[in-house]
């Protein structure tokens, strides 16, 4: 480590904390990063429309804060003198734990920065652990739009401006009985003055090398607290509410009177907590009447959020499935990324109780959002929630225990066919056409490895869920066999079929339409059927299929064995996302089903079995042929104008190490595959024009003349023949 080099210890999972680490690394700072969301190669990738793609490797990286002891301690003494400690936690519990553990690595010259992007007055908690072990504790707010794309991959969505604000969010008047906090106020005031050589000054100089990054030092704690409440109130009152109501158009959401009442009550409670905590009001959200009276202007809060959203739309490629233009909280909820929701919702409740302010609506919102995360298989405190399913899920499918059936691999018999027939003409009003039924209502949170793997994050389990199976069977019954249903399904969508207009949309029909049917094989020994194995049992690594974002419409009368593609995607998008690694699973499934029965002993038994399984055998050889085309053993037939474009994309993918463009969300930014296609559009169109024509244009003219000559000769021959 160089002399006078700024040493920063960054602990946190939020994109803002990762962003600060990235920018500090470019200023030659010594970065010690603690984050579980970094890949094993220790590379942190950032993408930006203006800055391009950037990678950096922290000087020291650990995934768990407890591992710091082996890297920062030697014979009980600290190996490095830490200048800056940046803490950004997911929950209040993890925040306290992090502060307690980090206090062993600080010294009298260390400045502790607490991320207050999701909470106000967090410094007293940190001071209780760092008091006497550091120079001071200061709050930091980073107003920048960052999004996590995947493990160790982030996007800087809005790189036009970034404001870094430092200050204190607590008021001394509320802590007169705490000398430690009062001492921190004095030390922080000196540090915030930006004296030459101070840690804060060196920290900001490293960040503001880029001209679009600005910094603010607020010496008045009341103004800093007001600034934080100005950011927090719209997040809680509108963004969290939009997640619950699944409506991201704020004006449409507030057209509902009950929703509007909840929104206004939340704003009133939050402004009341703000006034009790810092003794000031947010002038931006107030309307001053002619008599000098002030009242809350709810429209300004809506306009504030709409303005932020418009900035995102103007600066992002708003394409499925990233949804980068969504506000930070809905984006994280959609992608199942962790963010400090517990601090965002629970810290105001703690402050309300401390200062004697009513917060009944905020309490209800916190409980409701916590339950919503629980049903999604996540915990508001971070990590996975073990109780992902509701007890009401057992009612799905006419009283069938879906959870136990899927976990055990048990087949569903046709005992509910009568109920299904009775309900054919009934349309569930709660399930609209093309609507989406949550996976948490249909599947348990099982590991893609076939066992409960506690090491697998819940968000990955959510993506993998149901992606390791594929249907290959006809829904028709053959040989008079009884229809049975398999509980597993995943649609690769190779076929592009249109659906009939008489599609019935009831809850039972949509659920049963997603079930596979093995009776097409003519197998009547279902009692001995083995549970369906996941892909990994065949040595195939499953990549998330993201099936929960698609809605498959299927008619209850549809008996074809064709796989239905998601109607929300285009043909090209579907071919790009088709899972070629499923070939081995398809082939193994058909092979197992084809030779399911005991090996025939006589030729007549063999012939009978071949007649029964002729269609299945044909499917198996088609899959084998398709697989040979995929691996290049056979040429791919030119059946549509997309084929050459797909070849071009394959070249781009294979030229990128590790197939990153295929399997990660890198369709955004300067390295985007689609962006490359647009740049090469003229070349691609010339390629299509040349390759789609099987012969040069001159030969076409010669062939046309030859065909005309042959046709004239043939007509002359027929005329002469008839004349005779």
Swiss-Prot record:
GO cellular component: cytoplasm; prospore membrane
Compartments, record wording: Cytoplasm; Prospore membrane
Chain residue ranges for the region called Disordered: 407-427, 477-497
Superkingdom, taxonomy of origin: Eukaryota
GO process annotations (BP): ascospore wall assembly
UniProt KW keywords: Cytoplasm, Membrane, Sporulation
UniProt KW Cytoplasm keyword: yes
InterPro entries given in the database record: KPR-Related
Protein role: May be involved in a late step of spore wall assembly.
PANTHER family listed in its UniProt record: OUTER SPORE WALL PROTEIN 2 (PTHR21708:SF34), PROBABLE 2-DEHYDROPANTOATE 2-REDUCTASE (PTHR21708)
Name of the protein: Outer spore wall protein 2
Native organism: Saccharomyces cerevisiae (strain ATCC 204508 / S288c)
